Every structure is written in C-alpha cells, then in structure tokens.
Curated annotation (Swiss-Prot):
Keyword tags: Autophagy, Cytoplasm, Protein transport, Transport, Ubl conjugation pathway
Positions of the catalytic residues: 519
Oligomeric and partner information: Homodimer.
Keyword Transport appears in the UniProt entry: yes
Protein name (database record): Ubiquitin-like modifier-activating enzyme ATG7
Phylogenetic classification of the source organism: Eukaryota, Fungi, Dikarya, Ascomycota, Saccharomycotina
SUPFAM superfamilies: Activating enzymes of the ubiquitin-like proteins (SSF69572)
BP term (GO), one: piecemeal microautophagy of the nucleus
PANTHER family attached to this UniProt entry: UBIQUITIN-ACTIVATING ENZYME E1, UBIQUITIN-LIKE MODIFIER-ACTIVATING ENZYME ATG7
Family: Belongs to the ATG7 family.
Length: 652
C-alpha cells in the first residue's frame, strides 16, 4: 500500500484480553498428579486448554476464553479442531506458598515471552498458531485444605502499530472467500490474501497485499483478541511499516483497518515489552484462588484425605512403597473387642478398604473406655441390651470413613475342648467361617481365649492365608505371624504358629473361672501396643518380595525393614524381644498330619477334635510324644532308684 503522510490522525489499537475458565476437574486432576507423579518435582509440565473455534462463536463469546479441565493434562491427541482449538503450554507447580509468592512474576513472564521472541529471531518459524499462542500457569496446591492458587499468563510481544484508517467498502468483497477458508480448512489464524490465494508463509508475504486475522472473540467494541499482538510484532520485525488488516468475525461484524508502524519506537536489537499476566475481575493484576473444599462431595474429600498422608510417604521417605497392594487387601478380624477396635483403626490408617469383623459378644458397660469403636449408648440401645459387637464395629468404621467396605458377623467360632452340643448350629458356624476365609486375604486372630484360635489357625494354613496373632497378658503381649506352606520352600524352614511350642493340645480354659479370670485383666496400653505392632508387621510383610513366605531376620534392602516372626513385649521393664521358632512337626494346629486330615474330612475332623482333644493329639502325634516322654521319664527315674545295698554308699 502507498505510504501515509505524517499528518494522518493515528489511534492506538485496543485489544480484548484473554480469559481462563478453569473447571474443578482441572484441580482434581492436578492434585492427583501432584500426589502420585509430580511429588516434589516443580519443573514445567505440559498442559493444554481449548478455545472455541472462531466459526463456532456466539454472542456469549465476548472474550477469548481458554478452557481447562481434567483433559488438560492428557498427552493424547488434541481436541476436535472442528469445534475447538488446542492451546498448549506449561504448568509450573511449586511446593510451597512462599515459593509461589516469592517468584519474580515480571522476570518469569519476560523469560516466557523471550522464548517466543527467540523463535521469531531464528527466522525458521512461520506464523504457526502453536508457536505464537502459548499458555503458562504458575500454581501451588494446598492439598490438605483443597485450596489451589494459580495465575495464568499468555505472553504477548508489543510493537508500536497505530490505526490510521478503515475501509468498510473493500471489506465486503473479501468476506466470502475468508469465510469459506475458515469453514472448510485447517485452522490458520493469520495469513495474507493474494489474488484469492491464501499465503501462510512469512517469506511470501507482500506489503501490497491484505492481511487477515481470524478473531477468537466477538467483543462489541472493535477490539480484537490480544493474540493479534504477536503476529503484528512479527510483521514489524520483518520490515512491514504500512499494512491493510481484516479482523474477521463469523457474526458479520468484521472490520478493515489500515495500520502504520511507528518504527522509531521499535527496538531492533532488544527484546520488546512483554505482557500477559491475566487480570482479576476488578482489573488488577494478581493470582486467583480456587477453594474446592466446599464444592467437592464430603465423601470424596474424605477419600482423598485418607490417601494424602500415605502418598506423601512416597515423595521422599519410601518412594517404592506399594500402596495399592495394601489398599486391595481383604482383612478378616476374628474378635471385635479391644484388639479388634485398635487393629481396624490402624488398618484404615494404612488405607485398607475392606474389613470384616467376627464376634459373638454384646457390648457391655465396661467396653467403651477400652474399645474405641463403641460408645455409651451402644451398651443398651438394642432393647436394653448391648449391641452385637461385630455389627456395631462394622457400622462405626463406616461412620468414621464412608468409603470403607465393612461388614460384621455375629458368629461363634467352634473351640477346641468345647464338645459339640448343637451340631446343626456349630456346623453352620464352621461353614460360614470357612467361607469367610475363602473371601479374605489375611486373618487377624484377636480373640480372648487360647482355644478359640485353634480352628482359625488350621483354616488359615489349609487355605494358605496370611494369619497374624495378637495375645495379651497383664503387662506383656505377643504378636506373631504364622508360617505358610510354599512349594518353593522346604516345609522344615516354615516358621511356627501359635501352638508350635506346646506339647499338649489346647483345651477348655474358660470353665470354672473366677471373675478376674473371665475378664481381660491387662494394663490398658498393652492392647494399643500389640495392635499397632500386628498391623505394622502385616504391612511390612506385604512390602517384602516374598510376602508371607518372608524369612525372619535383618535386612537393609527392604522398604519397611525386616519382617520378624514373633515380637514379645514386657511393660514391667519396657522391653521387647524378637524371636523366631520353626514349625513343630507334631503341632496340634499346623502340622502336616492335622492339615492333611482336615483337608480329607473337613467338619467331621473338626467335630472329633472338639469332642475329644485326645483324638487331635493322636492325629498330630502329640500323644505318642507324651507317651515317649513319660517312658523316658520312667526310665530315668528307674536309673536313679537305689537298692538297699547301696544305701550305705550314698550315706557315706
């Protein structure tokens, strides 16, 4: 175009700023990535937003609005360009609010803008939409309070162009061809029209031809999107001084400008002024805050909060910790009293989601102070009686954390030494208990009598389940794991069970007991100690490469340290001992003889054992061991017998 005289009236170009629209799913995904993937890494990560395609704009698109949601972090294909245009960039998610505040915002914006400037200086980049339209977002996630601080920037380079005229008449003849190009071709935001041809390459631009900018907003004033700035700067750098420019809009409100560059104000060898930080609704510069605590479903908040502390372990302390294997465990707790209450709470703390209680007792007035899953009202709420422990414990867990899958069964476990007096009922209890073992991965034995643990011990080994045991004394406790049979290991190396040190089968220990013998008389803190150690032993076992087959002993290469066999604690001198005992081939609960007989006869074997402990001792070989011991004792005493003739010798 011909040059314009210096006396021509000039008018500065006004632009419509870009706005961001961030859906809550964007922050939900960001928090997930921060916990699981980014962790302490605050380097830039790719993101993308999407802008409504210019041919789809309507009266509500008075600002160019970039949308961000959960898909902004996807690394897959871009959005459908027929409806939306991808806008790519980076997120810088810092680790502290102080770091967010202390970052020099102007300096970092200049750095981002300089990246665009350097690409222009390089000269090898044409006016690609992706190159000249970048988004950057500075963010900080307060994951405990669900508050997200963020500030979007859309870097733009300034150049001193002025409006010196308009040409509405010439505009009309170009609109049809531009409209057809926008409607049918891949999106190009800035190009030149040369005899009806679309020219996209900067090297082919001619000053005498008309430039076209496809606007991404329909502002009522003639103020194009601020995206135009970067394209105008390219033209200024390439030596264009006077241009004709059409700002195309799909609603028929396009306009035609004649622009002139004030080249005296253009710094040839310096980075231009850079702007781009998004402003607040009041027009001031500043970051935004998204407080999702009141928007997210409380149950979802609880779910995320439970996982938060666990996932933070993986940031520095235990990066290889396998939380999924813990979360997916199905845990059966036999006993819903003091031990059951504390064990279940510790399991939930580790993220276990599936917990089942078995107990046959009701809540009494003495229970709530020691058993934290129960309260005073539970002692009389069932028609004057206490509620069933197992059922109430399961419901309490759901009240504490709604996402937990918790069930309770009022079930009496058949006990060795207690003869069968109602076979139908006890057989039903046995069948139900057997089914529960099938449906769970790990079993905790938390009952208050020795004989009640026998059948679960047998079932655990027969069904190859992880079994952990916790037992209390007045000022002592035992926590142990039972050994499991593995085809890969010699059974001789299997660690023992609760009964492996016994030379007699367990028997009735509940009959004819005084009150202090019937109640659990133990120092209150002992149960907490035993419960926590039992759960931690279980978690350490899951992190071991060999899981329940792990051999006891120290190791420096394990995620959570060693996996002992037994832990015995004593409060009278505040000591703990780690012990290891092998399985006993004549054990009344885990010996091969018992397991083989149980697998062969099932309930019939159990019934015979319940009715006659001698039958069990004969099956496992303990009876023969006892007889041999008696015989050896008799022989020893016989050797020590003195004849009358020897009396004088001994007396001398």
């Amino acid at each position: 175009m011909s040059s314009v005289s210096a006396s021509t009236e000039r008018k500065h170009i006004k632009f419509t700023p870009i706005q961001s629209f961030v859906e809550s799913s964007f922050f939900t995904k960001l928090s997930e990535l921060k916990l699981d993937e980014f962790k302490l890494d605050s380097t830039k990560k790719e993101i993308k937003g999407f802008l409504t395609h210019p041919k789809r704009l309507n009266k509500f698109n008075d600002y160019p609005t970039i949308n961000f949601d959960y898909s902004s972090f996807d690394k897959g294909p871009d959005v459908n360009e027929d409806n939306n245009i991808s806008w790519k960039g980076y997120i810088y998610n810092v680790n502290t609010i102080e770091e967010f505040k202390d970052i020099d915002k102007q300096a970092i914006l200049k750095r981002w803008g300089t990246e665009i400037y350097n690409e222009i200086q390089d000269g090898s980049v044409d006016l690609s939409y992706e190159c000249f339209n970048k988004v950057h977002v500075l963010a900080f996630c307060d994951l405990k309070k669900y508050k997200f601080y963020y500030w979007f920037a859309f870097p733009t380079l300034h150049s001193p162009w002025n409006i010196i005229g308009a040409d509405g008449d010439s505009l009309k003849k170009f609109i049809p061809s531009i409209k057809e190009f926008v409607e049918t071709s891949k999106f190009v935001q800035f190009f030149q029209i040369n005899d009806g041809n679309i020219i996209e390459r900067v090297s082919e631009f001619q000053e005498s031809k008309i430039f076209v900018f496809i606007d991404t907003c329909l502002s009522q004033a003639c103020t194009p999107s601020v995206q135009l700035k970067n394209y105008l700067y390219v033209l200024a750098r390439k030596g264009f001084e006077n241009i004709d420019l059409i700002i195309y809009r799909n609603n028929g409100n396009s306009f035609y400008w004649k622009l002139q560059l004030d080249k005296d104000k253009l710094g040839i060898n310096e980075v231009p002024r850079i702007s781009g930080w998004e402003r607040l609704s009041n027009g001031k510069l500043g970051p935004r805050l998204a407080d999702l605590g009141s928007l997210i479903d409380p149950q979802e908040l609880a779910k995320q909060a439970v996982d938060l502390n666990l996932k933070l372990m993986k940031w520095r302390i235990a990066p290889n910790l396998d939380l999924d294997i813990i979360k997916n465990q199905r845990v059966l707790l036999l006993g819903a009293g003091t031990l059951g209450s504390y064990v279940s709470r510790a399991l939930m703390g580790w993220g276990v989601r599936n917990i089942t209680f078995v107990d046959n007792g009701r809540i009494s007035y003495s229970n709530p102070v020691r058993q934290p899953l129960f309260s005073f009202k539970d002692c009389f709420s069932d028609e004057g009686q206490g509620e069933w422990k197992a059922i109430r414990a399961a419901n309490t867990l759901k009240e504490i954390f709604p996402d937990v899958q918790s069930k309770g069964y009022n079930l009496e476990v058949p006990m060795i030494g207690h003869p069968v007096n109602n076979e139908t009922k006890q057989k039903s209890s046995f069948d139900k208990l057997s089914d529960l073992f099938d449906d769970h991965d790990v079993v905790f034995l938390l009952m208050d009598s020795r004989e009640s643990r026998w059948l679960p011990t047998v079932l655990g080994l027969a069904k190859n389940k992880i079994v952990l045991n916790a037992a209390l004394g007045f000022d002592s406790f035992l926590v142990m794991r039972h050994g499991n049979i593995s085809n890969a290991n010699n059974d001789d190396t299997r660690v023992g069970c609760y009964y492996c040190n016994d030379v007699v089968a367990p028997n009735d220990s509940l009959s004819d007991r005084t009150l202090d013998q019937m109640c659990t008389v133990t120092r209150p803190g002992v149960a907490l100690m035993a419960s926590s150690l039992a759960v931690e032993l279980f978690i350490s076992m899951l992190q071991h490469p060999n899981k329940q087959y792990a051999e006891p002993g120290p190791s420096n290469n394990l995620i959570l340290g060693e996996v002992p066999h037994q832990i015995r604690g004593f409060l009278h001198n505040y000591s703990q001992s780690k012990l290891q005992t092998p399985n006993y081939k004549h054990c009344s609960a885990c010996s091969k003889y018992v397991i083989d007989k149980f697998n062969e006869l099932g309930w019939e074997f159990v019934k015979n054992c319940l009715n006659d402990v001698t039958y069990l001792e004969e099956t496992c070989g303990l009876l023969k061991v006892q007889q041999e011991a008696d015989l050896a004792s008799s022989e020893l005493l016989k050797d020590l017998e003195l004849s009358d003739d020897d009396d004088s010798e001994w007396l001398d």
